[in-house]
Amino acid sequence: MPVYATTSRPDFAKDMGFHGAKFPLPFGPAQGQEGMRKNIEMVKKWREVVGEDYPLMIDCYMSLTVPYAIELARRCEPYNVKWIEETLPPDEYEGYAKIKEKVGSTLLTTGEHEYTRWGFRMLLEKNCCDVLQPDITWCGGMTEARRIVALASAFDIPVIPHGSSVYSYHLQICFPSCPIAEFLVMSPKADKIVSFFGNLFEDEPLPNNGYVELTDKPGFGVELNREELTLRRPYPRD
């Protein structure tokens, strides 16, 4: 399964073989036009570093307004940004629809902080986005996520879940409408691939040259690393 990286260093992600890189937007409406200028400078810098065709995405983490998001998308068009993610809070359906109506070639994605299939139905019916991004561990688990994927398929909308490692992978491997997986680069300098769950699992699958290979083991294909598990109580017991 192909994987893209969420990272602070798209150049390292490309070197490690990932099929694209998503980086955080550093400035928002509170910083005004000076912040916008710095945002575009960063986009321009990363485009020059990784080359013309390498997929670049931007994560806005629900921090923008409708006018700001529209301006950002328009000013990013010369730099071939693949998508702009989560520009608004999750239930701002009317705002998302306005942005979608005004934006050109850049894809709009959202859904990480949407928690029910009824919310995802609203995103779809109001034409709020080009890609849905449910988090498997937040939206109701595997059963609910399957319903969301099926719902999205009726609108010809792909689903690229928010990164949750094996939980996302085993959903996505079953559906052709889930074209790529997200991997969160957790190493301090963003220069290494490390386990998303730390030492929790013995055999968590990790990307290799931009792909994750899953096994046919039962369940999610991983086992708890019991030697690393210790009980920590938030309050001391008498």
Task: List where the protein language model places each region.
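Short, small-residue-enriched loops and turns at beta-alpha junctions
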Residues: 27-36, 60-68, 85-93, 115-117, ...
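N-terminal capping/lid subdomain adjacent to the active-site entrance of alpha/beta enzymes
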Residues: 1-57, 61-63, 70, 74-78, ...
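Shared catalytic-loop signature of beta/alpha-barrel
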Residues: 80, 91-211, 215-218
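Conserved beta-strand positions in the central sheet of alpha/beta enzyme cores
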Residues: 20-22, 85, 133, 160
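Active-site-adjacent beta-strand anchor residues
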Residues: 6, 59, 86, 161-162
